[in-house]
């Protein structure tokens, strides 16, 4: 990875801040001397204080309903991680596609210096086992068979289309990063699979093993943001986003079994 200066002294909105990926990132950016706003629905007011304690201000937004009144003015950067997982396509499109474009529109109307980072997913690719994906590869509906995610791939594709269109129309420098498998010290597929193993629940794998991914740790997610932003342009550059090692579900389950007995 090229050397890129860390982000500091900026006014930043991080959406989906209550999620696994965006939360640690918002906390890290606040610690680097940025003014950080963490956005989520925050239906429970008590959810806000822990973020304030970490130096992250909170704003309430609802992408599906178009509730964006609290989006701050004069932002330098939006890091858009909010995502909805729904069995209903209309609900998924409202949040992941229309909501993403609306967010850019509102933020850009309130700032003349905005850059936009849109977190997409490698779930947008056509199902093709065992082959590395390039950003130009065919798109598809790979996550439809997964429990609770029948609309995920298609709505994330729709989100990319609308974000790309809106960036070009408004002239907002944008990068679309297709995230592979994120994990941290206390979250991610590995933790989930360990809990399944402890309960003797079979871990699903591809019929043609090994089931490989390129996992990326929270620390590397945080460190890679400035580099990815260097690709932002009004054409909304698309980049794959993962770790630099191929690792399979079979491998990490075997290793966790060895470590835990």
Where are these regions (language model features)?
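Conserved Rossmann-fold NAD(P)-dependent oxidoreductase catalytic core, especially the SDR/UDP-sugar
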Residues: 101-151
């Amino acid at each position: 990875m090229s050397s890129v200066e860390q982000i500091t002294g900026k006014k930043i909105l991080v959406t989906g801040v209550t999620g696994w990926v965006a939360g640690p990132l918002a906390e890290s950016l606040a610690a680097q001397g940025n003014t950080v706003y963490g956005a989520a629905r925050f239906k429970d007011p008590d959810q806000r204080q822990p973020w304030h304690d970490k130096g992250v201000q909170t704003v309430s937004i609802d992408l599906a309903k178009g509730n964006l009144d609290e989006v701050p003015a004069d932002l330098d950067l939006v890091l858009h991680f909010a995502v909805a997982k729904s069995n209903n396509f209309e609900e998924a499109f409202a949040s992941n596609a229309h909501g993403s474009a609306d967010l850019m529109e509102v933020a850009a109307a309130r700032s003349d210096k905005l850059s936009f980072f849109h977190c997409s997913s490698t779930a947008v690719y056509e199902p093709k086992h065992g082959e590395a994906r390039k950003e130009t590869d065919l798109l598809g509906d790979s996550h439809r068979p997964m429990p609770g995610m029948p609309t995920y791939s298609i709505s994330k594709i729709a989100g990319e289309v609308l974000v790309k269109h809106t960036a070009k129309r408004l002239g907002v420098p944008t990068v679309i990063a297709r995230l592979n498998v994120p994990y941290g010290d206390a979250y991610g597929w590995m933790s989930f699979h360990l809990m399944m193993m402890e309960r003797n629940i079979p871990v699903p794998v591809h019929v043609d093993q090994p089931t490989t991914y390129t996992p990326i740790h929270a620390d590397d997610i945080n460190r890679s943001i400035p580099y990815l932003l260097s690709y932002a342009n009004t054409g909304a550059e698309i980049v794959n986003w993962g770790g630099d090692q191929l690792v399979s579900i079979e491998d990490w389950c075997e290793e966790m079994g060895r470590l835990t007995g």
